Amino acid sequence: MMIQLIATPSNALVDEPVSIRATGLPPSQIVTIKATVKDENDNVFQSQAFYKTNEAGEVDLEKTPALGGDYVGVHPMGLFFSLKPKKAFHRLMKKDVMNSPLCICLDLYDSVNWLETVRIPSKASQRVQRWFVGPGVKREQIQEGRVRGALFLPPGKGPFPGIIDLFGLIGGLVEFRASLLASHGFAVLALAYFAYEDLPEKPQEVDLEYFEEAANFLLSHPKIQQPGIGVISTSKGAEIGLAMACYLKQVIATVCINGPTTITIFPLRYQDLVMTPIHPALERIQVHDSGALLFRYTTQYLHNKLNSQNILPVEKAQGKILFIVGENDECLDSKLHAQKAMDRLQRHGRSSGRMLAYPGAGHLIEPPYSPVCFVAWFPVLGQPMCFGGDLMAHAAAQEHSWREIQKFFRKHLLQSGSKL
């Protein structure tokens, strides 16, 4: 009987699970299944797990527990979320979402194959294509007034619920989440705010009027549903997202993933308002065993020293807010930040906020099955940064939160009677 490695679907969106089976092997055989992927800069990411075949000589990742390797137990998508860079501090992040998928090569070996130095030929292989964009999604490059970004539109006439997508101090234009949300029926503007085209190379302040201009641009687009938009935001972007929720009437549903609820590092300006930042206590930086920096403890003590000039007035938000926090976030104590905002809402008699806290999850809560990124190079610092996250807990948080994010936007952005 021929040895086969079967992965279905072999061509799908990155947030769709893949079923992996090996057949045609001897019973009770120890095997290795290895996943390998290269990013657009040819950096290699790999994962592997060791399994024992059943009496029929088969391994089914939905039923068979991994005995060892990068994870242990029954984890059908473990090979995907446990992918690690061969060179330290690389982060797997798709830049060109429209023209090519991530191509993951799965290899099956009929022994424990963990030594890089020993070349064993694989018994079977399978390629899996993972797309960040679904069929029919269109991308428009945006240069409107000061606004710079990319707008992803689902197929069809619309109008579609509109969302602005913001990342943190990584800078540039990050498109993979926007294109994926557009594949699920939302019109999403991936918005750059520094280190892109003619935008400032480094942020000196947060000019909220820039983000208001982006919100107005989105709402004026013929394919965007009225009367308001959503925001999905991570890290420093989530601080800006929360500020948009507080001050911009156009924003009616905001997702803040692991961000501060105070103004940090740079001042925030909006019309006549200037909010002064709190600065992290750099003497409280810790160095992880990997050599990466932990910033979690640099802002914890500051909560006692805050004044009204630093704290975002969440009670002013007209719309709904969903805080998503990883309790193992090593960049900041995001749960403490979100809890302070929730307490403030309660004190003002507001029930517009909700917090989803994930024990064991780190800072970079991405779409499902994304490789869990514990540490990565951080360009703004010129240093590696520790993001935190226990592999299994973080992977589970990515899967659960992605469903919750879509439910939240469908509930609060959709006009009655819309089908999505």
UniProtKB/Swiss-Prot annotation:
Q: What is its EC number?
A: 2.3.1.-
Q: Which GO terms describe its molecular function?
A: N-acyltransferase activity; thiolester hydrolase activity
Q: Which UniProt keywords apply?
A: Acyltransferase, Fatty acid metabolism, Lipid metabolism, Peroxisome, Transferase
Put simply, this protein is called Acyl-coenzyme A amino acid N-acyltransferase 2
Q: Which GO terms describe its cellular component?
A: peroxisome
Instruction: Name the active site residues.
Output: 235, 329, 363
Gene this protein is translated from: Acnat2
Report the function annotation for this chain: Acyltransferase which efficiently conjugates very long-chain and long-chain fatty acids to taurine. Shows no conjugation activity in the presence of glycine.
User: Chief location of this protein?
Assistant: other
What Gene Ontology terms for biological process does this UniProt record contain? acyl-CoA metabolic process; fatty acid metabolic process
Note the InterPro entries from the entry: AB_hydrolase_fold, Acyl-CoA_thioEstase_long-chain, BAAT_C, Thio_Ohase/aa_AcTrfase, Thio_Ohase/BAAT_N
